[in-house]
Regions:
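Hydrophobic ligand-binding cavity/cleft-lining segments
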Residues: 1-43, 149
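Conserved short-loop catalytic and cofactor-binding motifs
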Residues: 2, 35-36, 53, 117-120, ...
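Well-ordered beta-strand positions in beta-sheet-rich domains
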Residues: 2-6, 60-62, 87-89, 105
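A short, structured loop/turn motif at beta-sheet edges
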Residues: 8-12, 39-42, 66-71, 91-101
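Hydrophobic pocket/interface hotspot
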Residues: 14-18, 24, 48, 65, ...
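Glycine-rich portal/gate segments that line the openings of hydrophobic small-molecule binding cavities
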Residues: 35-82, 87, 134-149
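Beta-strand/loop substructures that line and gate deep hydrophobic ligand-binding cavities in soluble
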Residues: 77-131, 147-149
Length: 149
């Protein structure tokens, strides 16, 4: 259940985007707004309070940092109450030419979705995560200093 994308930005630049919780609704599909971000995000245990859906039919929920290795890996527990919790792992690695590869893995971390076979879960999350990594790439690439006049 891993989606990978090569990004034309450094690993440090991609990490800057991930480490700024206020960018979350810009690259995470389904999030419509950010309501608050803990000041020491993305330290383990910190949260982003966000809304899912289109106004006025929004659900207010949160995403919590499970673990973090700055510049390398971010593991999130994204809650979508009352339905489920997803465990999302983002791993960054260097590529030649100052580029970065992002690997995004999402698995159900609570019932009832965790009862579904991995292959069925993949059908639901792979297209969404491809779009998430595409959006993340666009945000990271947009701010490459050589590309800004």
């Amino acid at each position: 259940m891993t989606v990978t994308r090569d990004i034309a930005a450094t690993r440090e630049r991609v990490w800057e985007v991930l480490a700024n919780g206020w960018t979350y609704s810009g690259w995470v599909v389904g999030n419509s707004r950010i309501r608050a971000v803990d000041s020491n995000w993305p330290a383990p245990g910190t949260r982003i309070l966000h809304s899912i859906g289109t106004w006025p039919a929004v659900i207010n929920d949160e995403t919590v940092v499970h673990s973090c290795v700055p510049g390398e890996e971010l593991v999130l527990l994204a809650k979508v109450r009352p339905a489920a919790t997803a465990r999302i792992t983002l791993r960054l690695s260097d590529l030649p030419g100052g580029q970065c590869r992002v690997a995004m893995t999402e698995v159900a971390a609570s019932r009832p979705l965790s009862w579904m076979p991995d292959s069925v879960q993949l059908l639901g999350v792979a297209p969404r995560n491809r779009e998430c990594t595409w959006r993340l790439a666009k945000i990271a690439e947009q701010h490459v200093p050589e590309a800004v006049e």
